[in-house]
Amino acid sequence: MLIIETLPLLRQQIRRLRMEGKRVALVPTMGNLHDGHMKLVDEAKARADVVVVSIFVNPMQFDRPEDLARYPRTLQEDCEKLNKRKVDLVFAPSVKEIYPNGTETHTYVDVPGLSTMLEGASRPGHFRGVSTIVSKLFNLVQPDIACFGEKDFQQLALIRKMVADMGFDIEIVGVPIMRAKDGLALSSRNGYLTAEQRKIAPGLYKVLSSIADKLQAGERDLDEIIAIAGQELNEKGFRSDDIQIRDADTLLEVSENSKRAVILVAAWLGDARLIDNKLVELA
């Protein structure tokens, strides 16, 4: 497994792979890897000849400096996990390598609408940072496919739109959420939970499932469903942050023409902001 930290060396390897006619898959990550990331790697390996995993804690997508400062940097452990998975290439650049002149004056990619709604409304600049770094990685790695987790549902929708709008010839693969046995969605942020909070955390998925059951039973008073769910989260020990029920295909308000809904939930548990989602077919 090659570990590359500079743009010239990455370009050199990508040119070689292209000359050899290899099909390349990219798995963009911020490190602190868990089994959910490994599922992305496995999906990439099944679809391509060569798998490139990027590990880069992107300062441009953090709306709070304290979150950036405390995000775990576990490069050695991450590389050991990826080596066991027989990943071909790890791209682990420094911030200076990606943003040599800083982030303030760096060219950015913005996806209007999707960047500022839902999660984007409460995290200004976050999705602009995501679309900028992902587009830069696409230009550098030139992958045939790229794998992203469905846990970050809005992010996946944003990347699909960016790829379509910008004409990237890349297949975007959404990989289903991986959960612990008790239902908690795997996330790097779960590491912020204390032992006691970890026992409470599966309650998020239980509330999510309760909303889904109501929708599948034909309930359509969305305001009431959301209000009850928020109350349930608070009673379980969370601080409900945002609960949305949206059209899964547009992320707009659910209408009588909507065929699928996505339930998007965000809640604080201690210092961890947990997010989860669930798709529901509407009768």
UniProtKB/Swiss-Prot annotation:
Subunit structure: Homodimer.
Binding residues annotated for beta-alanine, in chain numbering: 61
GO cellular component: cytosol
Family annotation (Gene3D superfamilies): HUPs (3.40.50.620), Pantoate-beta-alanine ligase, C-terminal domain (3.30.1300.10)
Pfam families linked to this entry: Pantoate_ligase
Binding residue positions for ATP: 30-37, 149-152, 186-189
Main location: cytoplasm
Binding-site positions, (R)-pantoate: 61, 155
CDD domains in UniProt: PanC
Signal peptide boundaries: none
Gene that this sequence comes from: panC
Protein family per UniProt: Belongs to the pantothenate synthetase family.
Protein name (database record): Pantothenate synthetase
One function term, GO molecular function aspect: ATP binding
Pathway, per record: Cofactor biosynthesis; (R)-pantothenate biosynthesis; (R)-pantothenate from (R)-pantoate and beta-alanine: step 1/1
Annotated keywords: ATP-binding, Cytoplasm, Ligase, Nucleotide-binding, Pantothenate biosynthesis
Extra remark: The reaction proceeds by a bi uni uni bi ping pong mechanism.
Entry's EC annotation: 6.3.2.1
NCBIfam families assigned: cyt_tran_rel, panC
Enzyme active site: 37
Organism: Escherichia coli O1:K1 / APEC
Annotated PANTHER family: CYTIDYLATE KINASE/PANTOATE-BETA-ALANINE LIGASE, PANTOATE--BETA-ALANINE LIGASE
Catalytic activity from the UniProt record: (R)-pantoate + beta-alanine + ATP = (R)-pantothenate + AMP + diphosphate + H(+)
HAMAP family, A to Z: PanC
